[in-house]
């Protein structure tokens, strides 16, 4: 019911706002774009007759009711059907994928995994008009500078003849094509893979795949090295060491008793690696390598990077997780409101969880780690329901005593 009234308010108020402000904003933007060299023909084709899209604003402002556990995230993305389809495409597109691996050093299975996660192998490219969506977001104000820049780049792509304004479709946030490139990413990394003089990431798979491989190579991909692998941690493992920022050579982890999930020796990999626990100390554990950081440049989500690694592993013939994510750890997820409650309580106890926004960012994770260290809990930074219950209990007791600030504790960085 609350959602209904919110949407009703948007539908009633937004057109008034649009009529009074959007047209003048768009006129000023057109002048700016023309001054930057965008042709009048492109401006007319892309911007004439557009209006703010209420659906785009709704999607941009929406916050999920519940956080998504790693088990849920992986279960929705690394499915049997997606693995099977990926294996089929690995064979069907062997010539293209082999050529890309040779040229860029990106494994075939990794490119297929990105393709599967971004658009389900081209099945869901998005149907939003990109110029209209970006203009809506640039006008709305929350991240206007970013989307204004993206809109200018989208117009430059049209102006260069890569796609028509009518055919520039994608996600509500402006991501385009098989690999969901933002316009700025397109202009920086997109490649004409089929040699026809245009870069068509919507219809040309060689263009889309070459562009993705080029991006990953430029982001620092390490050939012949993994993104992540599932590991088994020894009894008595110091959970404080399980965080992305804590990097050790693989041989150091071996000396600490870490093995692969099936109890085999860890692979020999150059560089330093970290242990991450996406669902807390009771869930699956992963060792992540330099290529994990490369994937995080594509999408700043630990769960996304692990899903890329796991889908690539299974598409290449590897097994599913040994420690099944859905059966390990605390199955429940906090609601956004519950996480806000935890953040507020941690802040009031002097542990600096950052803005009370219901988003599990690095500052919130660090504050949880500090709290866990103070209370002799496994220090994993994970907002499990049991941790929330203890935080609320501690906060209530401290508030009743008039001494909310907790004693100093070790510092952690995610």
Walk through the language-model features, giving the residues of each.
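Positively charged n-region of N-terminal signal peptides that target proteins for export
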Residues: 1-4
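N-terminal signal peptide c-region/cleavage motif recognized by signal peptidases
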Residues: 13-15
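Cleaved targeting-peptide boundary
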Residues: 18-26
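Low-complexity, glycine/alanine/valine/leucine- and proline-rich hydrophobic stretches
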Residues: 290-291
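Short acidic, glycine/serine/threonine-rich helix-capping segments at coil-helix boundaries
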Residues: 332-339, 347-391
């Amino acid at each position: 019911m609350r959602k209904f009234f919110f949407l009703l308010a948007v539908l009633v108020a937004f057109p008034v706002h649009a009529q009074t402000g959007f047209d003048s904003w768009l006129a000023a933007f057109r002048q700016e774009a023309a001054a930057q060299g965008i042709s009048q023909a492109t401006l007319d084709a892309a911007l004439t007759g557009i209006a703010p899209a209420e659906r785009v604003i709704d999607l941009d402002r929406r916050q999920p009711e519940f956080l998504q556990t790693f088990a849920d995230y992986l279960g929705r993305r690394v499915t049997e059907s997606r693995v099977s389809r990926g294996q089929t495409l690995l064979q069907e597109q062997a010539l293209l994928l082999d050529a890309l691996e040779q040229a860029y050093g990106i494994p075939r299975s990794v490119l297929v995994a990105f393709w599967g996660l971004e658009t389900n192998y081209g099945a869901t490219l998005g149907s939003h008009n990109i110029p209209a969506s970006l203009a809506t977001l640039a006008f709305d104000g929350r991240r206007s500078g970013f989307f204004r820049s993206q809109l200018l780049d989208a117009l430059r792509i049209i102006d260069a003849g890569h796609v028509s304004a009518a055919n520039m479709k994608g996600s509500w946030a402006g991501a385009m094509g098989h690999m969901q490139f933002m316009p700025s990413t397109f202009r920086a990394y997109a490649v004409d893979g089929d040699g026809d003089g245009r870069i068509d990431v919507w219809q040309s798979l060689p263009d889309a795949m070459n562009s993705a491989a080029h991006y990953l190579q430029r982001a620092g991909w390490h050939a012949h090295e993994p993104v992540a692998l599932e590991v088994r941690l020894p009894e008595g493992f110091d959970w404080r060491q399980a965080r992305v920022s804590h990097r050790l050579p693989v041989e150091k982890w071996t000396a600490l008793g870490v093995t692969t999930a099936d109890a085999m020796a860890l692979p020999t990999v150059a560089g330093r690696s970290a242990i991450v626990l996406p669902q807390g100390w009771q869930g699956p554990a992963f060792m992540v390598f330099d290529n994990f950081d490369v994937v995080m440049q594509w999408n700043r989500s630990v769960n996304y990077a692990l899903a890329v690694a796991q889908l690539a592993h299974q598409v290449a013939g590897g097994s599913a997780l040994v420690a099944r994510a859905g059966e390990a750890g605390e199955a429940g997820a906090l609601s956004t409101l519950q996480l806000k409650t935890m953040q507020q309580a941690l802040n009031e106890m002097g542990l600096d969880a950052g803005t009370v926004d219901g988003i599990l960012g690095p500052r919130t994770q660090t504050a949880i780690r500090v709290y866990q260290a103070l209370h002799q809990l496994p220090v994993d930074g994970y907002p499990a329901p049991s941790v929330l219950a203890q935080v609320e209990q501690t906060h209530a007791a401290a508030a009743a005593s008039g001494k909310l600030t907790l004693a100093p504790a070790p510092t952690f960085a995610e």
